[in-house]
Amino acid sequence: MKFYSRFIALLGMLVAVSAFAGIPDSPQQVQPPSVGTRAPIFAARTAQGTLRTFEPDSYKKPTVVLFYRGGWCPYCNAQLSDLHLVEPKLRKSGFEIVFLSTDRPELLYSSLKATDIHYTLLSDSHLEAAKAFHVVYHVDAATLAKMREYGVDLEATTGTKEHELPVPSVFIIDTSGTIRFVYSNPDYTIRLGADALWAAAQPLATVK
């Protein structure tokens, strides 16, 4: 029994080390899942701190899952404002829309410059969901210093000392839990626009 316990503990440590070692050092190295693969299990917290878990077999609606850097990011705010134009059409077509931010739960809404948000905003401050989708990378010291110059303290906004960010990415997952669309661009200034998202989503609409 003692040997078994030690084995399990060692296995857990190896998994943890492997997961850490597998995180790229640049956004260009991330490898998100491909179209046609099963969506990973992931969880994130609401602004109230409630944990929501998403499993491949539990999707009642086709779902848009979007990873963004945080409310402090002007490009993220611009994207959320742009997608606001297509959000009513997506909902009427039967979609759920889930946005995942690195901000702590209590900062989810207060940090945003965009207003009148009707998306489901969830906190992925430890980037566990981003890791599940393989879109997370380590932020180097030079970038961290530049962010601080602009008044962005990543440790304060995430509540961690991991210094990680997601590559801004969009996934569309159907009701079977299969990924049907992927957009992931290592250049955080280039985002998927509302028209492109709507075009990608239409084939999966459950309400015509």
List each model region and its residues:
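Short active-site neighborhood of thiol/selenol oxidoreductases, capturing the structured segment around
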Residues: E55-L83
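Bacterial N-terminal signal peptides
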Residues: I8-S18
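N-terminal "domain-start" segment that seeds a small globular fold
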Residues: I23-E55
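Short loop/turn microsegments at loop-to-beta-strand junctions
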Residues: A39-P40, P62, V167-S169
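A short, polar/charged loop-to-alpha-helix boundary motif
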Residues: Y188-P203
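Thiol/selenol-based redox catalytic cores and closely related redox-interacting motifs
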Residues: D124-T189
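Structural microenvironment flanking redox-active thiols in thiol-disulfide oxidoreductases
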Residues: A78-H134
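Bacterial N-terminal signal peptides that target proteins for export
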Residues: M1-A9
